[in-house]
Amino acid sequence: MKNKKKFFGDKKMMIPTIPTPDELLDKGFSRAKKTASEVRSKKMPKRLKPKKIEEARVITACQVIKDRLKMINDRVPTIEELPEFYQDYIDITVGVDDMKQALGALNWAYGIITQLEKDYSKKIRRSPPEKASTLRSQAYGRISSVVHKISKDLDILDFAKNRLRNMPTIDFEATTIVIAGFPNVGKSTLLSQITDAEPEVADYPFTTKGIQIGHIERHWKHIQIIDTPGLLDRPIVDMNDIEMNAMVALEDLADAILFIFDSSETCGYPLEQQFNLLEEIEEIFNAPIKILFNKMDISDYYNNGSRFEYVNNFIEKIEEPLLISAMEGKGIDEILKLLDSVKKIEREDY
């Protein structure tokens, strides 16, 4: 079976329905039974008919099972041909090695069943009529054994289908901005303020609400903005290795990071702790990082209040930060101009 696969235009891993071994065998054997009835109704020498019937059953059963295995294999995109982000996503959620092994097992089964089809067709043609049924039963037994040997591999592919069907749809030609910052700093509010429509929500490992993707069209430039609640909003030291991999996978997407501070600290995290998170993200991502100080309207900053010097101490550490209030819609135009300035990073995804 040729291992020729395609990467679909909508960027999704469209794995077909995966049958169980019994479902696969039932379909093959039931179709073979219908074929046998058709052969039985034809006129031919009495001595030849039993052999033709049983040969047709073997060939049909093998062909039906092989066609299903080939269809599964052909419709799963070649992992190495996917953009790096999707390769990482599959590895984190399913396991690239497990998927490759499962697809390899389907190739193996296809080859063995092809050989069984040839061998038993020949045996039945050369056998006495009274032995044709016995040989067909032997063939069915061998076919069943092969299919049951790939039971775990079919389970892996079924698991992959369920885990990957809601994977994010990414436009790799768009300029991509990834939002970071502690919970409740105003990321969702900002996303809704600057994007054209309700953000798409898709599955992403270790996010609390799924990855959220918003889109903006600016001067014939498509910008997608990604928020990952539960991932880029806590200290890296608290993450395990798999969570770290999920975060690093975003490096394959980001043309820039939009890091949001809550200047009022009403999010529950002191500015110093927020600043530490920024420094950790700077160590992970090579993409440029743009800094916003949100909730400036309630930070007592503009009134030269008691928190002015405290907040200003952190603002002065940042080169060209934007001071905004996402809830009030203040600073949105400046943010959009900032996004206009982000240049797409050229990557070899294909």
Please name every model-derived segment.
Residues L190-L191:
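Post-Walker A alpha-helix
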